[in-house]
Amino acid sequence: MSSRGNRNIAISAGSLAVLLGALDTYVVITIIVDIMADVGIAINQIQQVTPIITGYLLGYIAAMPLLGRASDRFGRKMLIQVGLAGFAVGSVVTALSSDLTMLVIGRIIQGSASGALLPVTLALAADLWSARSRASVLGGVGAAQELGAVLGPMYGIALVWLFNHWQAVFWVNVPLAVIAMVMIHFSLPARQQVDEPERVDVIGGVLLAIALGLTVVGLYNPEPDGKQVLPSWGLPVLAGALVAAVAFFAWEKVAKTRLIDPAGVRFRPFLAALAASLCAGAALMVTLVNVELFGQGVLGQDQDHAAFLLLRFLIALPIGALIGGWLATRIGDRLVVLIGLLIAAGGFVLISHWSVDVLADRHNLGLFTLPVLDTDLAIVGLGLGLVIGPLTSATLRAVPAAEHGIASAAVVVARMIGMLIGIAALGAWGFYRFNQHLATLAARAAGDAGSPMSLAERLTAQAVRYREAYVMMYGDIFLSAAVVCVIGALLGLLISGKHEHAEEFEPAYAPTYGGGGAIDPYDAGDADDAPTEMLDLPTQVLSAPPSDPGDERPGRHRAP
């Protein structure tokens, strides 16, 4: 098989690992009621189990910067293998859990281990494809991630239906992880040792993890009362997070080894792409969590039917990812990000006007009509999907190739932080607004009361008020998501243009495939698209920059 074929197999195997990690990011969304029943939490206290979701995301975020940098030192293949093994261990802990504490611990282990899968695969794509053509490849990897979002909720329902208990969702991960490890072993390139391997900034990674962890804890309010958005411990804990963040930046300023080496980094487009990724992540999680809750709380649907409402969004998301990667190679990352987030913002504005009759409502477009719920969710999914590949590509083009591992991790960290904010901050604020709306409706009903009502009439009126308060709360949340998307679109204007990227040089090492056997050079017909780290060229040629800046050869790396 040609080296080009090996390259495609490698990225396919990496995408499979990404899919496995992505499934468990979203799988608990549709089985959370079953989990609540087992751990003894009432259905009207759903905010108490958000650590099951945030624990996974926090582990993902906290570990990812270190794992991204570690992949630059130890190689992509090793980190993916370690991630899959740890993921299997975390799945066993989660499946054996009998209380909320152990369940959250298992989810944190899962998230920490799976933190390697997506960023390292994205970095692998950056290693093997040129800056000019990698956007579509990154879009494909992003589509694998979003396929996890598509399959995850339905996957959970299917396994619970098949095995009659939610633990099966996590037991199934063990053989799947083993299969993926075997495939990765024979598919991904092994990195040869170099004289001076990259060092890992452990202190910086720990400080960043502490800052993020304290932020999540400070935003988590298990008992919203309509008077305080944050819990009683919120402000002190957030102050501690701020101190940890300041310590992180101070350390990064003086440390010899840093999570992101500033040399060669174009910070304006780099930070803009990360901030836009954060906005996209917040909007994504708002949709995944609140659409299903809208179905249960407002439309009165059961868990399975409410989960199926997400299908419109989840199908459009990977389609948008593929289209976005294709478009970015032709019109540039900046324009695609701007268009995608503005489309998503428009969709959220439409969703914010949903009523209790949304299933019957239709958009009147003159010559024809479209169902409101289906159309609005598809618009949001398409818009958020469009930006997945371009945001990653823009971030990687703003840093030297030696930083691709940590830069890929930074993209996903930013997105996951946004997801955490979406479920923690907007969720707490949403329940705060719910209690405010409920109090307002109750006061209005008391003022309008005429003759005394029977107990049944009072209960019916109260149920109506609760439903109206839920509609108003979700309207507020989705409108906030629209604002977040507009902010992300404006930030997208600051990312790199179509032809702006850090100058790339040849890599300092030549990876090999499978069991370490050397790869034959590309055939002459493949030479124009061959990653140069796989070519047997003289060292003096590899160390020289290209004479023509426009001549982008795939896989060129900045010299260390």
From Swiss-Prot:
The record marks 146 as: Forms salt bridge with Arg-426, probably closes bottom of cavity. The record marks 415 as: Forms salt bridge with Gln-157, probably closes bottom of cavity. Residues 362-371 are annotated as: Beta-hairpin. Its main location: membrane. GO terms for biological process: lipid transport; response to antibiotic. It holds the Pfam family MFS_1. One of its GO terms (cellular component) is plasma membrane. It is found in: Cell inner membrane. Induction: Part of the lrpG-MSMEG_3069/MSMEI_2992 operon. Resistance to ethidium bromide is inhibited by reserpine. The chain crosses the membrane at residues 16-36, 48-68, 78-98, 108-128, 143-163, 168-188, 200-220, 229-249, 269-289, 307-327, 336-356, 368-388, 411-431, 477-497. One of its GO terms (molecular function) is lipid binding. Residues 519-560 are annotated as: Disordered. Has a canonical major facilitator superfamily fold with two N- and C-terminal domains of 6 transmembrane helices (TM 1-6 and 7-12) and two other transmembrane helices between the domains (TMA and TMB) that form a hairpin. Between TM9-TM10 is a periplasmic beta-hairpin that extends along the membrane plane, TM11 and TM12 helices extend into the periplasm. Asp-24 is a possible protonation/deprotonation site. In association with lipoprotein LprG transports triacyglycerides (TAG) across the inner cell membrane into the periplasm; TAG probably regulates lipid metabolism and growth regulation and plays a structural role in the outer membrane. TAG (and maybe other lipids) enters the central cavity of the P55 transporter from within the cell inner membrane via clefts on the cytoplasmic face of P55 between TM5-TM8 and TM2-TM11. From there the lipid is probably transferred to the hydrophobic cavity of LprG. This is Triacylglyceride transporter MSMEG_3069/MSMEI_2992. It comes from Mycolicibacterium smegmatis (strain ATCC 700084 / mc(2)155) (Mycobacterium smegmatis).
